[in-house]
Amino acid sequence: MTTLSLDLHSSGQTVTVAPGDRLELRLEENPTTGFRWYIENDKNDVLILEHDAFTHVHDGVSGSGGTRDLVFKVAKQGQITLRASYRRSWETQKPPHGTFELTVTAK
């Protein structure tokens, strides 16, 4: 069982993993502005979202940013393109402020 650590620079890449492995995705975020990362296709049978949390860079500093920490377990063989968007939840008609896309092949 392996844990693969990824960040925004991994967007556009393809990774190969095995069932039982984990993907750890850390994306910079500042929810005080209303923006946060949303997984667009979290309903799939290849990756299971096990952890979704925000970590402040500077604890106790109002308005500071941090990272959205996401951990996925590879549940079975297959292929999925994991997509995330950086947007405000109430701005559904606007394009996202940022995107992340990763093709995951599990074999």
Where are these regions (language model features)?
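Ligand-binding face of N-terminal immunoglobulin V-set domains in extracellular IgSF glycoproteins
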Residues: 70-71, 83
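Glycine-centered tight-turn and secondary-structure capping sites
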Residues: 75-82
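Short acidic/polar inter-strand loop motif in beta-rich domains
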Residues: 87-94
